[in-house]
UniProtKB/Swiss-Prot annotation:
Belongs to the glycosyl hydrolase 9 (cellulase E) family. It is an enzyme of class 3 (hydrolase). Its EC number is 3.2.1.4. Glycans are attached at N259, N464, N484. The keyword Hydrolase applies. Residues 1-26 form the signal peptide. GO terms for molecular function: cellulase activity. It is found in: Secreted. SUPFAM superfamilies: Six-hairpin glycosidases. This is Endoglucanase 10. Keywords: Carbohydrate metabolism, Cell wall biogenesis/degradation, Cellulose degradation, Glycoprotein, Glycosidase, Hydrolase, Polysaccharide degradation, Secreted, Signal. The active site is at D109, H442, D489, E498. It comes from Arabidopsis thaliana (Mouse-ear cress).
Length: 525
């Protein structure tokens, strides 16, 4: 009786083991089959990490990067999160009976330059549209939208009629000789505008791009505001296109600060965003018909506040990834092919890899504000990689050599990691991140104690101080190292140690793409 019972127990366990093994084999087979069907056997693979896994490193950096926009705000501050900032620029625009008090100060000074500010808004919008879910996962979507709206509120008021756009508040000749807190400014802040007599195509078109992209961001949450933005975008694009002329030529004073090298890229950029916002084929025809004239097909360029071609090429590539009815468009195909050439130039092991790279791996193009091209390139690479993975395209060919889509993402991470401290200097270039970061940032508000009252000139005692800034400009991405990977942390070094809003907008986009398992929506609408 006892032997029989033992025998039956042994048989039961044996059968259970067989069944369990069969189930495991079936699961493994199913996973392999699904992987093969999805194309992962081609070596592309999905984005690493389990769905929804948050990378704390990038999440912490993202929160800081967005905080920098609060530091740069002008106007009457609502829900002020920065203890050493207060209301400023409240009378901006009053000489022409306008309220231009909002907007952002451009960098470490107190000028509101409309051209880079609009670009900041466009990039912020793009980042939110593509990676809003990732931002939301770490509670940063609302801060991003708040900062965007602070800019677009300003841009709306800077465009009081169809063919008039105020593009600057303040005069660098008056502002730059001063070193004071924005709250203490008493100098005159004259206005600069473009109109039919003094056109500025690049600024009008960039502002149109900002308005069009932002209209998509607010389409669901505030349809009325979205419609207002889109109306302004259409008017500004028409103004930019029908009254062509470079603002750098017509207003030569801007050349020393934000000199434009041409307006064709902004026209294509604005038309691309207007197509995404409206699906009006007129705008798609515009980029197809004017590509030969403006797009520099086959010649990779660097994405920046001045040159929007690479961004336009990636944005239009998105249409071919996700809109099958446009797959036969020859005009769009040229944009996508050039976008691929840009990507191949960024991959370190590509036959066409750029030589504009430091020994530590940082994309490096110019001494002044060297981080701009690295952060913009990384942002575009992350986008393109996600477009590929979302549409189940896992390979990119560079002169016959095959690379995985995830290698573009790896490149993007390498640039982000460099900025966050993984570099030969062992320093983070994002203020407040890590144990070692710049202490003497070229930034007036950060360098002067909040309880100090200074005039134009007596604030220079703080500029010349040997003590670190009393206020930390959290999240500011400074200019960056020289090609030989040296860096001087000094207020007297704006070339390397001054932050800008547009660099931070690109950083927000990059970090948002990396903060969790990454993907993009098939439609921006």
């Amino acid at each position: 009786m006892e032997e029989k019972s033992k025998s039956r127990g042994w048989c039961g366990w044996f059968i259970a083991i067989i069944v369990l093994a069969s189930v495991i084999l079936a699961v493994v087979y199913t996973v392999k089959l699904r992987t093969k069907k999805s194309g992962d056997d081609d070596g592309g693979g999905p984005v690493p990490g389990p769905p929804g896994a948050i990378d704390k490193k990038y999440a912490d950096a993202l929160k800081l990067a967005l905080q920098f926009f609060d530091i740069q705000k002008s106007g009457k501050l609502e829900n002020n999160k920065i203890p050493w900032r207060g209301d400023s620029g409240l009378k901006d625009g009053s000489e022409d009976n306008l309220d231009l008090s909002k907007g952002l100060y451009d960098a470490g000074d107190h000028i509101k330059f409309g051209f880079p500010m609009a670009f900041t808004a466009t990039v912020l919008s793009w980042s939110i549209l593509e990676y809003g879910d990732q931002m939301n996962a770490v509670n940063q979507l609302d801060p991003a939208k708040d900062s965007l709206r602070w800019i677009t509120d300003y841009l709306i008021k800077a465009h009081p009629s169809d063919n008039v756009l105020y593009i600057q508040v303040g005069d660098p000749k008056v502002d730059h000789p001063c070193w004071e807190r924005p709250e203490d400014m008493k100098e005159k802040r004259p206005l600069t505008k473009i109109d039919v007599d003094t056109p500025g195509t690049e600024v009008a078109a960039e502002t149109a791009a900002a308005m069009a992209s932002a209209s998509l961001v607010f389409k669901d949450s505030d349809p009325t505001y979205s419609a207002t933005l889109l109306k302004h975008a259409k008017q500004l694009f028409n103004f930019a296109d029908t009254k062509r002329g470079s603002y750098s030529v017509n207003i030569p004073e801007v050349q020393k600060f934000y000199n434009s090298t041409g307006y064709g890229d902004e026209l294509l950029w604005a038309a691309s965003w207007l197509y995404h916002a409206t699906e009006d084929k007129t705008y798609l025809d515009y980029v197809s018909n004017h590509g030969k004239e403006f797009a520099s097909f086959g010649n990779p360029t660097w994405f920046s506040w001045d040159n929007k071609l690479a961004g336009t090429q990636v944005l239009l590539s998105r249409l071919l990834f996700f809109k099958k009815d446009l797959s036969g468009s020859k005009g769009l195909g040229n944009y996508r092919n050039t976008a691929k050439a840009v990507m191949c130039g960024l991959l370190p092991k590509s036959p066409t890899s750029t030589a504009s790279r430091t020994n530590g791996g940082l994309i490096w193009v110019s001494e002044w504000n060297s981080m701009q091209q690295s952060v913009s390139s990384a942002f575009l690479a992350s986008l393109f990689s996600d477009y590929m993975l979302t549409s189940r395209i896992h390979k990119i060919s560079c002169d016959g050599k095959i690379f995985k889509a995830t290698e573009l993402r790896d490149f993007a991470k390498s640039q982000a990691d460099y900025m966050l401290g993984k570099n030969p200097l062992g320093t983070s270039f994002v203020v407040g991140y890590g144990d070692k970061y710049p202490q003497f940032v070229h930034h007036r508000g950060a360098s002067i104690p909040a309880d100090a009252t200074t005039g134009c000139l007596d604030g220079f005692k703080w500029f010349n101080s040997t003590k670190p800034n009393p206020n930390i400009a959290y999240g500011a991405l400074v200019g960056g190292p020289f090609f030989n990977e040296t860096f001087t942390d000094s207020r007297e070094n704006p070339m390397q140690n001054e932050p800008t809003t547009y660099n931070n907008a690109l950083l927000v986009g990059l970090l948002s793409s990396l903060v969790t398992t990454s993907s993009t929506l098939q439609s921006l609408k």
